[in-house]
From Swiss-Prot:
It comes from Pyrococcus abyssi (strain GE5 / Orsay). Its main location: cytoplasm. The gene is rrp42. This is Exosome complex component Rrp42. Keywords: Cytoplasm, Exosome. Component of the archaeal exosome complex. Forms a hexameric ring-like arrangement composed of 3 Rrp41-Rrp42 heterodimers. The hexameric ring associates with a trimer of Rrp4 and/or Csl4 subunits. It is found in: Cytoplasm. One of its GO terms (biological process) is rRNA catabolic process.
């Protein structure tokens, strides 16, 4: 057994013993998030942006848009694409190069949560049906990784979308060209999906796992909900099994915690307008 494995075993035993006493390694309750800070409009050249600090985890999201063609199977819908970059300085486990499995999973789950909740109304992003639509790029940069990237990215992504203002455009039927106007308008964001992540350590579920907790967890589940009472994404990862009653508890708690976070997002967006 290597020294790293011995240290990991000691840490796991310590964390589990604390959990059995109703405590966490950082003194939070089982359903408590670390402090959440949200600041929007932080990238001057982006059409929307948000910086989120979740404890020591930090992520930056920028929104850019362009005009392009719709996908052939959705001619009357705009396009949204999500990309996650794990900046090497954020963690010794992040390496330069193309997106790895972690980045792909993060992007896929966040994209699904927004898309399936219809938070961004893609039908309202059509300029010329079947020909020209608005294309929205959600670019995520992880600046510091101290656990629970999923929730930090999800919060930052929807906050940045709410913050975005894009140039108004007008289609000239006579010339067949799209004219870009001087005015701007918000993106058609109609819901606020929020992911809530649980780590299972032993037989106990904790919200918003820190990096230390993630290193010893048996499994992880993320549940994304919106304010209309719908679940738009569920992602289980890192192995492990969840009993039905554990999943039901996670769903109930996810709705409750998401509502709290949603208020913080709206407060940050409104503050930036003042």
């Amino acid at each position: 057994m290597s020294d790293n494995e011995i240290v990991a075993g000691i840490m796991r035993d310590h964390i589990i013993n604390l959990l059995k006493e109703g405590k966490r390694i950082d003194d939070r309750g089982f359903e408590d998030y670390r402090p959440i800070e949200i600041e929007v409009g932080v990238i001057e050249k982006a059409e929307g942006s948000a910086l989120v600090k979740l404890g020591s985890t930090q992520v930056l999201v920028g929104i850019k848009t362009s005009l392009g063609e719709p996908f052939p199977d959705t001619p009357n819908m705009g396009v949204m694409t999500t990309n996650v970059e794990l900046v090497p300085l954020a963690s010794p486990t992040f390496e330069p190069g193309p997106p790895d499995e972690r980045a792909i999973e993060l992007a896929r789950v966040i994209d699904r949560g927004i898309r399936e909740s219809k938070a961004l109304n893609l039908e309202k992003m059509v300029i010329v049906p079947g020909k020209i639509v608005r294309v929205v790029f959600i670019d995520v940069h992880v600046l510091d990784h101290d656990g629970n990237l999923m929730d930090a990215i999800g919060i930052a992504a929807i906050a940045a979308l709410l913050n975005a203002r894009v140039p108004k455009v007008r289609y000239n039927e006579e010339t067949g060209e799209v004219e870009t106007l001087d005015e701007t308008e918000p993106l058609p964001v109609e819901k606020i999906p929020v992911p809530v992540t649980f780590a299972k350590i032993g037989n106990i579920l904790v919200v918003d796992p820190s990096l230390d907790e993630e290193l010893v967890m048996d499994g992880k589940i993320t549940i994304t909900t919106d304010e209309t009472g719908h679940i738009s994404a569920v992602q289980k990862s890192e192995g492990g099994a969840f009993k039905l009653e554990e999943v039901m508890y996670a769903v109930e708690t996810a709705f409750k915690k998401a509502e709290e976070i949603r208020k913080l997002i709206l407060e940050a967006v409104e503050k930036a307008k003042q």
